[in-house]
C-alpha cells in the first residue's frame, strides 16, 4: 500500500517549518507526528498548514523550525469529538518530505488535485466585497472504505459553474 499512488487525492506544498513535531498516534508500531508549516499564497498571505508525518520519513526528535521543506502526500480529514460537538480537522498526510534551500519564487510551488463526490448542495454567494464564491463539501474516497471530507471554495466563474453541481455528482 505504501508504494501505491492515490490518484484522486494529491497535494504538494512548500513552506517553512513553524513548530516542533508533536506526537499524534501509533499504527502497527509506526509513530505519527504533527508539525505546522507556513505556506505562502500567490497574494503573499500565508497559511499555517498542519502536516502529519511518519517517524520513518524524518527524524522527529530534531528541531527543524525555520527550515524550508516540500511535502507531497494527501489532504486528509477526521472528526475530532469535542465536548458537545464534532470538529472537522484537516491536514496534509506526508508521503514524501524534501528539505530545500529556500522557497522558490513562482506560482506553481503549491498544488492540490482532489477527485470525489459532492456531499451537499453547493452554497453560492457574494462576499461583502462583491466576489462570487461557492462553498463545496467533497468526499474523496480512500482504500479500505474510508473517505476524506474536504471543504472547498470556488471563485468567480468557477463558483457560478460549481453552483450547478448536484449531490452525489462526481467532480
Where are these regions (language model features)?
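OB-fold and OB-like single-stranded nucleic-acid-recognition modules
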Residues: 1-171
Amino acid at each position: 500500500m505504501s508504494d501505491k499512488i492515490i490518484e484522486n487525492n494529491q497535494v504538494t506544498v512548500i513552506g517553512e517549518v513553524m513548530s516542533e513535531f508533536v506526537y499524534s498516534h501509533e499504527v502497527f508500531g509506526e509513530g505519527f507526528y504533527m508539525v505546522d508549516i507556513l505556506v505562502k499564497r500567490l497574494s503573499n498571505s500565508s497559511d499555517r498548514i498542519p502536516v502529519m508525518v511518519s517517524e520513518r520519513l524524518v527524524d522527529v526528535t530534531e528541531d527543524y523550525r525555520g527550515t524550508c521543506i516540500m511535502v507531497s502526500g494527501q489532504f486528509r480529514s477526521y472528526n475530532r469529538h469535542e465536548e458537545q460537538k464534532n470538529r472537522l480537522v484537516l491536514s496534509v498526510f506526508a508521503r514524501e518530505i524534501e528539505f530545500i534551500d529556500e522557497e522558490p519564487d513562482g506560482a506553481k510551488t503549491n498544488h492540490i488535485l482532489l477527485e470525489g463526490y459532492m456531499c451537499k448542495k453547493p452554497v453560492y454567494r457574494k462576499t461583502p466585497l462583491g466576489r462570487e464564491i461557492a462553498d463545496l463539501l467533497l468526499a474523496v474516497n480512500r482504500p479500505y472504505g474510508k473517505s476524506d471530507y474536504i471543504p472547498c471554495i470556488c471563485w468567480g466563474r468557477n463558483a457560478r459553474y460549481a453552483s450547478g453541481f448536484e449531490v452525489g455528482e462526481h467532480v
